[in-house]
């Protein structure tokens, strides 16, 4: 019987959870769920100078916001240093690793010689078979692995296929530094083994590490997990992803008004697809996702595609759920604080009532917030340039003409107001747009908004008529 699947996401807490890391976490999470297994979380915090508690908190917060839950407690790699040291010393006892007393000066000479000979710098193995009794006084040794010197190391990768590395290129690399701290290469192997990780899904920039890590697995006689090295994300222009392309933290996407479900849907399709399906539920992703279907080629990040997908999710969202998502993100978005401060019971009710019209036109929560500002605007309204041009003499004359009919309206509903304005259009011979445009400008201060009858209904009779009268003068 095969072992249950255990994946892991292992970020370094030296900054935010960037978009590439978020996709790696998503792929690990989906594969674990698809296989009925677990996804574990390990914080690779051995770089004590650059690792911060704030970065760890940001990573956990980003994963939680994306809806990517992990099994058990997050594990600190730094706290496992004694175990890493124990395994390194066990490898020495097994004859699979050795103490190296080469001085910094000797290592510098090796590098210089390699440079002169035009080859990559390599440790020359001078302590590989020497007796430690010959060690110079006062030199604290490192521990180096005895890497195989002939043949190849094979990495069997579910995405990249079989990848072979000449052993002559692998070097007797360090697994324990002279101060007793483990190298990244060693700590990762020990942790993955001890945590029972069966599948490693990570960026293909780790592919060369996989060969060296395989050497450690083999030396300890441990099973090598199934490797899947996924392609990196590039910008829309094919260049390596940078901040101008979208290499931002997950928190930045939240502040830009994207919904977590939409971002998940977008990220899953960066390097993986299921036929022509663009929009898929989380349940469908879990059912369909398999690492063997991940593409080898780099995926391209496209903000327009992300916005389009986010718009689909917003239009499909329940009004109250979307309202709650907007309220939660207001402190983080431009102009959001002013809305939050003005949000009393009456305006909360108006905002929720406006949601059907607002979400039809907005691609992000930021656009949604911006479109909702007419609810919070103080009278007399400030007009933008287009609205001011609509409220010229002709526009104000239209308002003056339609105002009595609106004042006489019985019910103040979208349907009845639609009927009032259409009847007025027929009576005066004006096209509906000729009435709706100055009405919209007087009610919102803008030339674009949700449907004008929705706006009239949301604002209510008293506020709507007051705003129209303000512009008639």
From Swiss-Prot:
Its EC number is 6.1.1.17. GO terms for molecular function: ATP binding; glutamate-tRNA ligase activity; tRNA binding; zinc ion binding. Residues 114-133 have a biased composition (Basic and acidic residues). Residues 114-136 are annotated as: Disordered. A motif ('KMSKS' region) lies at residues 240-244. Pfam families: Anticodon_2, tRNA-synt_1c. Monomer. HAMAP family: Glu_tRNA_synth_type1. This is Glutamate--tRNA ligase 1. It comes from Brucella anthropi (strain ATCC 49188 / DSM 6882 / CCUG 24695 / JCM 21032 / LMG 3331 / NBRC 15819 / NCTC 12168 / Alc 37) (Ochrobactrum anthropi). The lineage of its organism: Bacteria, Pseudomonadati, Pseudomonadota, Alphaproteobacteria, Hyphomicrobiales.
């Amino acid at each position: 019987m095969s072992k249950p699947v255990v994946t892991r996401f292992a970020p370094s807490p030296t900054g935010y959870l960037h978009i590439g890391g978020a996709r790696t976490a998503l792929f690990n999470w989906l594969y674990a769920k698809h296989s009925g297994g677990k996804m574990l979380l390990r914080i690779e915090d051995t770089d004590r100078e650059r690792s911060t508690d704030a970065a760890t908190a940001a990573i956990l917060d980003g994963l939680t916001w994306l809806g990517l839950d992990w099994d058990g407690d997050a594990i600190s790699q730094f706290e496992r240093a004694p175990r890493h040291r124990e395994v390194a010393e066990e490898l020495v006892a097994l004859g699979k690793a050795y103490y190296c007393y080469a001085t910094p000066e000797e290592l510098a000479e090796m590098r210089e010689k390699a440079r002169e000979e035009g080859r990559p710098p390599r440790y020359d193995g001078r302590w590989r078979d020497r007796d430690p009794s010959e060690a110079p006084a006062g030199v604290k040794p490192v521990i180096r692995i005895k890497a195989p010197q002939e043949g190849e190391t094979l990495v069997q990768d579910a995405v990249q296929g079989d990848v072979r590395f000449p052993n002559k290129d692998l070097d007797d690399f360090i697994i324990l530094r002279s101060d007793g701290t483990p190298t990244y290469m060693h700590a990762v192997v020990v942790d993955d083994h001890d945590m029972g990780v069966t599948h490693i899904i990570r960026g293909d920039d780790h592919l060369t590490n996989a060969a060296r890590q395989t050497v450690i697995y083999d030396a300890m006689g441990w099973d090598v997990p199934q490797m899947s090295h996924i392609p990196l994300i590039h910008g829309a222009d094919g260049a390596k992803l940078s901040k101008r392309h979208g290499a931002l933290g997950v928190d930045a996407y939240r502040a830009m008004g994207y919904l977590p479900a939409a971002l998940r849907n977008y990220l899953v399709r960066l390097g993986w697809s299921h036929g022509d399906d663009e929009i898929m539920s989380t349940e469908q992703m879990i059912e369909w996702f398999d690492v063997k279907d991940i593409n080898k080629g780099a995926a391209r990040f496209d903000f327009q595609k992300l916005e389009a997908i986010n718009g689909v999710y917003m239009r499909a969202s329940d009004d109250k759920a979307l309202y709650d998502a907007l309220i939660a993100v207001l402190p983080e978005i431009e102009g959001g604080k002013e809305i939050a401060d003005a949000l009393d019971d009456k305006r909360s009710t108006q905002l929720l009532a406006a949601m059907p019209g607002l979400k039809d036109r907005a691609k992000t929560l930021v656009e949604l917030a911006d479109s909702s500002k007419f609810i919070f605007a103080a009278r007399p309204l400030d007009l933008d340039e287009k609205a001011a041009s609509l409220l010229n003499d002709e526009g104000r004359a239209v308002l003056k003409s339609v105002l009595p009919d609106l004042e006489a309206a019985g019910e103040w509903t979208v349907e009845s107001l639609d009927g009032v304005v259409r009847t007025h259009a027929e009576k005066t011979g004006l096209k509906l747009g000729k009435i709706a445009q100055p009405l919209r400008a007087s009610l919102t201060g803008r030339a674009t908004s949700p449907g004008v009858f929705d706006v009239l209904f949301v604002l209510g009779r008293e506020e709507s008529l007051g705003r129209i009268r303000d512009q008639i003068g």
